[in-house]
Amino acid sequence: MITIAVDCMGGDHGPRVTLPACRHFLDRHADAQLLLVGRPESLGAFSHQRAKTVAASEVVSMDDPLEVALRRKKDSSMRVAIQQVKDGAAQAAVSAGNTAALMAISRYLLKTLDGIDRPAIAGQIPNAKGEATTVLDMGANVDCSAEHLLQFAMMGSALVSVLNGKDSPSVGLLNIGEEAIKGNEVIKKAGELLRSASKAGDLNFYGNVEGNDIFKGTADIVVCDGFVGNVALKASEGLATMIVDFLKMEFSRSIFTKFAAIAAYPIISALKKRMDHRRYNGGALLGLRGLVFKSHGSADELAFEYALTRAYDAARNNLLDRVQARIAHAAPLWGASGRSVPSGAAVPV
């Protein structure tokens, strides 16, 4: 039985979204059980034989500064959910709450894996191959060293191997051009480290990739700093929404275009489904001594259910053990521990 702790109070909508999503998830996964963390008065109406309520009296808001979330709200639903993972009561935690707070609390309670300096958020962006490109970091670290980018590549490779079933996923380094001579000093050095790791058989380095390659599916994994990754994520979601809106606008211009819309409905429906970012919700916080997944704060029921499913798949397929094994084997490439740079603030996802 896979047990997931759910921060039911987090996000823009709280229990109005998380509870229905939890019910849908349980209906589809007979070997899963949920620990619903939150204020009892907000969760009291929910009843399921494979769900248990865990009381938490406080809520971390989307605007709470780190000091408040980490030091003052010690009985927040977010913190209590992560505590379940630390205590072994759950194999993974899921929250749609404040990203910076989630990362800080997760690092404080779970600690980072040996050989990892900074956890990273790994998310998915749909591509032209009908799959998804895994991008990391997506907002945890706005400044990264070359060693950090190598660590991200190692962790991302383990993630895609486990969740996508690819034995040797390709890794691309996001750059302003494909040539090795392009990019700043951090990117150039990261390229050297990734090529060395690839020659040693520790990962499958494709080479430098550009922004459009994310959507082409040129590489299974794209590594970058959290600032760039977060911008790419939000840009892709905005583009998908704009395309759908444009189609609606054009097909509603006249009686003739409305008839055309009826004829084209199956194609439009399939396109909309492939571009639906809700199906790719759920970013993994990689590099921790426990599994934590971040849902979009604005997630609806379907999106939050997908985040729960990704956490379930990760726990069922022993993602944490796979990441630990890969890092332990490859850590000598960056001297056992990546060299640190001044810590960057998290970018809310």
Curated annotation (Swiss-Prot):
PANTHER family: FATTY ACID/PHOSPHOLIPID SYNTHESIS PROTEIN PLSX, PHOSPHATE ACYLTRANSFERASE. GO terms for cellular component: cytoplasm. Its EC number is 2.3.1.274. It is found in: Cytoplasm. Homodimer. Probably interacts with PlsY. It catalyses: a fatty acyl-[ACP] + phosphate = an acyl phosphate + holo-[ACP]. Catalyzes the reversible formation of acyl-phosphate (acyl-PO(4)) from acyl-[acyl-carrier-protein] (acyl-ACP). This enzyme utilizes acyl-ACP as fatty acyl donor, but not acyl-CoA. This is Phosphate acyltransferase. Keywords: Cytoplasm, Lipid biosynthesis, Lipid metabolism, Phospholipid biosynthesis, Phospholipid metabolism, Transferase. Pathway: Lipid metabolism; phospholipid metabolism.
